From Swiss-Prot:
One of its GO terms (cellular component) is cytosol. Pathway: Amino-acid biosynthesis; L-lysine biosynthesis via DAP pathway; DL-2,6-diaminopimelate from LL-2,6-diaminopimelate: step 1/1. Keywords: Amino-acid biosynthesis, Cytoplasm, Isomerase, Lysine biosynthesis. This is Diaminopimelate epimerase. It catalyses: (2S,6S)-2,6-diaminopimelate = meso-2,6-diaminopimelate. NCBIfam families: DapF (TIGR00652). The lineage of its organism: Bacteria, Pseudomonadati, Pseudomonadota, Alphaproteobacteria, Hyphomicrobiales. Its main location: cytoplasm. Catalyzes the stereoinversion of LL-2,6-diaminopimelate (L,L-DAP) to meso-diaminopimelate (meso-DAP), a precursor of L-lysine and an essential component of the bacterial peptidoglycan. GO terms for molecular function: diaminopimelate epimerase activity. It is found in: Cytoplasm. Belongs to the diaminopimelate epimerase family. It comes from Nitrobacter hamburgensis (strain DSM 10229 / NCIMB 13809 / X14). Gene3D superfamilies: Diaminopimelate Epimerase, Chain A, domain 1. Homodimer. The gene is dapF.
């Protein structure tokens, strides 16, 4: 029947990024890829990422957070999802600051500069080709050789690549809506240059403090927002000296503020986390789960 049958959940969103939060700290158990897919199946709870809180493994942390995409694959990081998790735990505990463990490492969260906003310290970006990772060596990952379309007239080319705990490729364009990301996204996500697949972003630098973007998420497809992609894009633009270290990011679902902090290289993401409804998983969803 599976771990999640009859278990409570919260449906939330981070600027349109559809999030389901499940707290298993009082019932430690692993969630399988099959269960994660079942949650998003017809009759279930549609989501982009499933955030599962499990008992803390390290002192001083609230939980180990496992993150699943709607195809059942695990993600190392999800900034929008972490804001949703943070809101739920803030409201339950009344604490001023929280630390969670994820596959990407420790993430600290605190109340944002205004009511309803939450900040997540996403840690430092990584630029080495092995760290992203890429399948072959590139000494300079500010741009890599990768294109879509004819050699002499590519539609997209020369993306910047960054790891924010998960791999990102950012293509710089004049208009993020002028390209068929729904078509190119899955092809680029699964390109051989990305051995762990990649999140694919189209970004337009509208000013030194404003970037417009759309993302095809690895394992989730087109989403209204991707927090780690916003972080990666802001960092990549600053690295090219085309944007400042504090940038407003404009995504289809809303806005985020990203700061690439100079003193320690950490990337801070600030934005809302919206509670939609609470429920209990229907056991019928997991009838075929071993």
């Amino acid at each position: 029947m599976g771990t999640l049958a009859n278990h409570a959940f919260s449906k939330m969103n981070g600027i349109g990024n559809e999030i389901v939060v499940v707290d298993l700290r009082d019932r430690p158990a692993a969630v399988t890829a099959e269960e994660a897919r079942a949650v998003a199946s017809p009759g279930g709870v549609p989501y982009d990422q499933l955030m599962v809180l499990q008992p803390p493994r390290l002192p001083g942390t609230e939980a180990f957070v496992s993150i699943y995409n709607n195809d059942g694959s695990e993600a190392n990081a999800c900034g929008n999802g972490m804001r949703c998790v943070a809101r739920q735990v803030f409201e339950a505990t009344g604490k001023a600051a929280l630390t969670f463990e994820t596959r990407a490492g420790l993430l600290s969260c605190w109340q944002g500069p205004a009511p309803g906003l939450y900040t997540v310290d996403m840690g430092p970006p990584k630029f080495g080709w092995r760290d992203i990772p890429l399948a072959e060596e590139f000494r300079d990952t500010r741009y890599i050789e990768l294109q879509v379309g004819p050699i002499d007239a590519p539609v997209l080319h020369s993306p910047s690549v960054v790891s924010m705990g998960n791999p990102h490729a950012i293509f710089w364009v004049d208009d993020v809506n002028a390209h068929d990301l729904e078509r190119f996204g899955p092809l680029l996500e699964n390109h051989p240059i990305f051995p762990e697949r990649a999140n694919i972003t189209l970004a337009h630098i509208a000013g030194r403090d404003r970037i417009v973007m759309r993302t095809w998420e690895r394992g989730a497809g087109m989403t209204k927002a991707c927090g780690s992609a916003a972080c990666a894009t802001a960092v990549a633009a600053a690295r090219l000296k085309r944007a400042d270290r504090v940038v407003d990011m404009v995504l289809p679902g809303g806005g985020l503020t990203i700061e690439w902090r100079e003193r320690d290289d950490h990337v801070l993401m600030t934005g809302p986390a919206v509670f939609e409804y609470a429920g209990t998983f229907d056991p019928a969803l997991f009838a075929s789960v071993a």
